[in-house]
Structures are given as C-alpha cells and as structure tokens.
C-alpha cells in the first residue's frame, strides 16, 4: 500500500498541484499516504490517474431448498415438511339431562378422530406426527335465559383412563369448568408442546399417541334430549413428517371395520344401524350377496336428510346423506340375521 502511495505522491500532476499549494497534494507529499482519509485517497487516485484493479464479483443466486424452520410456535410450518392448521370446528350438539344424576360424553383428542376434527382429520391422513400449540373447547348456549340446568366441561391428559361416570370422578379431573346452561363458557386446555405420533390403529398406546380426553357432563334440566347449545373446538395444530396418504374411506364386511371411523355400526338381530359420528356430507354404499337380502335403508334422526337409491335385485343401496349433527342413523334391515352385508362410507 505504501508503494502505491509513493507512486501517487511522485506523480507529476500531484507534484505540480503541491507546488501550487493544493492542500490535498501538500498533505500527501509532506505527510504520506497513511495520513489521508478514505475519501482523500480516492481523490488522490483520481488526480494521479490511478486505475484500481478490476474485481470480479460472483452474483448471489436464490436458494432452491426448503427455508429453515421458524421458531415461533404459531408460525407456518416448514414447506414440504410440516403444516400448521388453526381453526374452529363443531364438536358436538349439547342436549339436556333431567335430574341430579349427570350424563357424560367424551372424545379422544387425536388428529385423525373424525368426531373431534371433522376437517383436520382428512389433512392428518398425510402426516405421521402432530404437535398441539393451542386448544380450547367452547360452549355456546342455544337456550333461553329461563332454562334450568348445568353444563360442565373437563379434560384428562391421559386418554387411556376410563371416562368418569360420577360427579366425583368428573371433578377429580385436573382441568374442568362449569356453567349455567344459558351462559357461554370456555375450557382452555394447557398444552405441553410435545410432538406425538398420529394414531394408526386401535391397538396403539393411548399414552403415547393421544393428547387427552375431553369430557362433557349435563344435568338438572327440565326436559331430556332437548338441544341447549353447541360445543366448538378451537385449535392450532402442527402436522409434520409427511407420509403416504392413509385410508380415507371406511369399509366393513359386516363384522370387521377398516379405515377412519365415520360411522359406528351396531347389530341387533337382523337390524344393522350405522350411527354417523359427525356433521357433514356422506356417501354410504350397502351391498348384499343374495337378491332381496335387505330392505331399503331408512334415515333416523332429526338432523339427517338425503337420497337413497335402492335396487333389490342385486341388492345394493347408494345413500347420499347430509347430517347436521352427530348421532344420526342409517338403518338397514336384513331378511335374516345371518345374511352378510358389505358397506363402505365415503366423505363427500
């Protein structure tokens, strides 16, 4: 660098300017290159006609890989590896129970549980793991202020425990709230931030794959089975570790059911009932093995509607159904109790 400065100082143009009293030239000649500031050095180079070496710059190119994951728990997931879902879904319709003896209903919190997560359960078929970052159960009343009765919500973080059947057992739960039927109430469930595997089968260990169990209790109403409100589940869940899509249809050969639980079958003699676990649109196909093996299916419940196309010769029935609430039933009557049936349920 000193050689460069000496060359510029000995430049005839700089020497001439120094003799004429130019301050920059005088400073360079008398005090040296190191005494100049950066801007003064640039001006001196221009005066001496000095051309700096040409530097080659490699242009920056955009990365074509996944971005690093964000640390915020509510931030979007890493592209191609995880997905964050924040939503509020209808969990259940709350019905009143008369007397002081409460009735109980419960749901296991697992992303593929259609009864708890009607929409998320479909997305969860593409992932192996999940992490819950926020979870709240909301009770929304749909009754008058004169309605008697109590509604209680509880949560057990161990889904393998037996659901409570008494008030004492319910209030032993680690987290619970209670309210009058005409008053809204939220149950904010604490989360642990753990990443769990998504349940694949009923044989999986509930302690490892399920987040917990939500419990609803009602009692003290003047009338039974009257709608008093609705339950909603509000959540933020991160799905991770993409995998091949799991089964999205439920099929049965009359005894064994495979796939997600859209309906719960029950058999009583020659009668088969398929109870739908959630509100939604469904296509149910029922097929027998002999002509006239079953009669035309019927719809049971105040919240179910749809069309049933039935052909006795084959026999086969195609049912396109809409359920406004859980618990609605499609009833099939067989000509004999031993007559096998096959049925498949699709989500529409």
Curated annotation (Swiss-Prot):
Domain of life of the organism encoding this protein: Viruses
Principal location class: virion
Record keywords, A-Z: Calcium, Capsid protein, RNA-binding, T=3 icosahedral capsid protein, Virion
One matching Pfam family: Carmo_coat_C
Record field: compositional bias (Polar residues): 74-86
Family named by the database record: Belongs to the icosahedral plant coat protein family.
Subunit (UniProt): Homodimer. Homomultimer.
Physiological role: Capsid protein self-assembles to form an icosahedral capsid with a T=3 symmetry, about 32-35 nm in diameter, and consisting of 180 capsid proteins. Also acts as a suppressor of RNA-mediated gene silencing, also known as post-transcriptional gene silencing (PTGS), a mechanism of plant viral defense that limits the accumulation of viral RNAs.
Protein name, as recorded: Capsid protein
């Amino acid at each position: 660098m000193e050689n460069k400065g000496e060359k510029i100082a000995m430049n005839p143009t700089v020497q001439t300017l120094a003799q004429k009293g130019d301050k920059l030239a005088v400073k360079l000649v008398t005090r040296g290159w190191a005494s100049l500031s950066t801007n003064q050095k640039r001006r001196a180079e221009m005066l001496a006609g000095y051309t700096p070496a040409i530097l080659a710059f490699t242009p920056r190119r955009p990365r074509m890989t996944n971005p690093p994951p964000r640390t915020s728990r509510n931030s979007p997931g890493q592209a191609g590896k995880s997905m964050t879902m924040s939503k509020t879904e209808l969990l259940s319709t709350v019905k009143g129970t008369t007397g002081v003896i409460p009735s109980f209903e419960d749901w296991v919190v697992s992303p593929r549980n259609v009864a708890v997560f009607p929409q998320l359960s479909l997305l969860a078929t593409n992932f192996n793991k999940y992490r819950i970052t926020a979870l709240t159960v909301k009770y929304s009343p749909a009754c008058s202020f004169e309605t008697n009765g109590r509604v209680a919500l509880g949560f057990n973080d161990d889904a393998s425990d037996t659901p409570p059947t008494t008030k004492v057992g319910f209030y032993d739960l680690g987290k619970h709230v209670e309210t009058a039927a005409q008053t809204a109430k939220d149950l904010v469930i604490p989360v642990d931030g753990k990443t769990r595997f998504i349940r694949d089968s009923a044989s999986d260990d509930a302690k490892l794959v399920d987040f917990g169990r939500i419990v609803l209790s009602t009692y003290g109403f003047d009338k039974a089975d009257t709608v008093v409100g609705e339950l909603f589940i509000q959540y933020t869940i991160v799905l991770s570790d993409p995998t091949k899509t799991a089964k999205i249809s439920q099929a049965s050969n009359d005894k064994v059911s495979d796939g997600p639980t859209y309906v719960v079958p029950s058999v009583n003699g020659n009668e088969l009932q398929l109870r739908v676990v959630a509100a939604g649109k469904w296509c149910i196909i029922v097929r027998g093995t002999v002509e006239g093996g079953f009669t035309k299916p019927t719809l049971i419940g105040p919240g179910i509607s749809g069309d049933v196309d039935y052909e006795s010769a084959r026999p086969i029935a195609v049912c396109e159904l809409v359920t406004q609430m859980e618990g609605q039933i499609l009833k099939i009557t067989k000509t004999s109790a031993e007559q096998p049936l096959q049925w498949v349920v699709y989500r529409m």
